[in-house]
């Protein structure tokens, strides 16, 4: 296999595994549904495909949501269809309103029920071409969708299974890579050099990456609640990443100021040292989170932070900051505060990575 093709497969391995699971789930659901003579086997096939997610925890959540929405909508639609006449057009319109309004409202306030309006309609009007009563149709739909959902979960557990706890580490690494790009922008601004990255694009991708960490962490918590995993709670990782982003935002806003001499000349090399060691630590920690290995030590980062703090103290003793405008002095101290705040969060990040290490 050529190197570019191999690299492409490695880069898209999670997506390829998901594609295989979805295909297997659909085929298995159709075969089993046909073998047991489900009334409408395609509902089981649809459910198996929709339930199969990127992780086992995601599949469980999708299955639970689908079952709750389907059962609620089918029960409501079946009851209305049985109790209320709808042969006449005017009756059908009233029944349509009575069906959609409550279920749509419920779906709006409880996203778990987002399938309820559709299922209720299917139960009500899907019987027009069959001899089934609405109640019989409701029972069939719930049975078919439940069967498909269980098949989807089973395939997620057996075929190239992906645990959300492992995906959390990969998602966290993506966030840390983007934080390193932000640090490169901040350092370039401090040194009054052109930015090596498009900061607006980085910030937009960072929002998406952090949201993915939150979603994956929730799926991992669901795996823990269903006893499919006994890993540490991933929630602290998501919170630590949010705090690190806030830390970088704090000292980043201060660093983009144009500092006069001698502040920029004296602090610039030390800030560059912090940026270099911090970036190296975050990248190595991201790899450790993704591969479940021991994280790197913080010694180099702490050393450069201490050197920066010492130079800042020397500037303060020399009253260099008092000679500057209030805005400049405020930015200098904000920069120092952000860096010191980040020290505690870096220690927390390393501890969280160490908890997840398997070696």
Regions found by a protein language model. Give the residues of each.
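Positively charged, phosphate-engaging catalytic surfaces used for nucleic-acid and nucleotide handling
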Residues: 241
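A transmembrane helix-and-boundary motif of multi-pass membrane transporters/channels
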Residues: 1-210, 217-218, 351
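Short linear sequence motifs
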Residues: 23, 35-39, 244, 301, ...
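A contiguous, well-structured pocket-lining segment that forms one wall/lid of small-molecule binding clefts
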Residues: 238
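Long, hydrophobic alpha-helical segments that serve as membrane-spanning/inserting helices
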Residues: 1-17, 31, 167-234, 246, ...
């Amino acid at each position: 296999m050529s190197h570019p093709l191999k690299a492409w497969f490695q880069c898209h391995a999670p997506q390829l595994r998901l594609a295989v699971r979805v295909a297997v789930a659909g085929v298995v659901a159709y075969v089993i549904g046909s073998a047991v003579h489900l009334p409408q086997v395609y509902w089981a096939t649809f459910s198996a495909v929709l339930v199969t997610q990127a992780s086992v925890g995601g599949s469980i959540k999708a299955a639970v949501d689908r079952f709750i929405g389907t059962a609620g909508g089918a029960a409501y639609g079946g009851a209305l269809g049985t109790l209320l006449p709808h042969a006449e057009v005017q009756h059908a319109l009233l029944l349509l309103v009575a069906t959609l309004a409550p279920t749509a409202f419920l779906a709006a306030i409880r996203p778990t029920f987002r399938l309820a309006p559709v299922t209720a309609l299917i139960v009500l009007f899907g019987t027009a071409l069959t001899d089934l009563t609405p109640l019989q149709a409701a029972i069939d739909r719930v049975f078919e969708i439940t069967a498909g959902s269980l098949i989807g979960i089973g395939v997620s557990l057996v075929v190239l299974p992906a645990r959300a706890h492992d995906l959390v580490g990969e998602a966290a690494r993506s966030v840390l890579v983007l934080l390193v790009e932000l640090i490169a922008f901040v350092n370039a601004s401090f040194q009054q050099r052109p930015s090596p990255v498009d900061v607006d694009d980085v910030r937009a991708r960072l929002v998406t990456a952090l949201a993915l960490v939150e979603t994956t962490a929730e799926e991992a918590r669901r795996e823990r609640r269903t006893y499919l995993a006994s890993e540490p709670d991933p929630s602290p990782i998501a919170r630590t990443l949010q705090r690190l982003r806030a830390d970088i935002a704090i000292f980043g806003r201060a660093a983009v100021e144009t500092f006069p001499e001698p502040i920029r000349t004296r602090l610039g090399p030390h800030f560059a040292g912090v940026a270099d060691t911090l970036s190296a630590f975050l990248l190595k920690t991201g790899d450790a989170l993704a591969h479940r290995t021991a994280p790197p030590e913080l010694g180099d980062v702490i050393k450069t932070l201490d050197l920066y703090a010492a130079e800042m103290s020397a500037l303060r003793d020399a009253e260099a900051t008092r000679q500057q405008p209030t805005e400049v002095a405020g930015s200098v101290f904000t920069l120092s505060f952000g860096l010191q705040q980040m020290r505690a969060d870096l220690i927390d990040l390393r501890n969280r990575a160490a908890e997840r290490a398997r070696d």
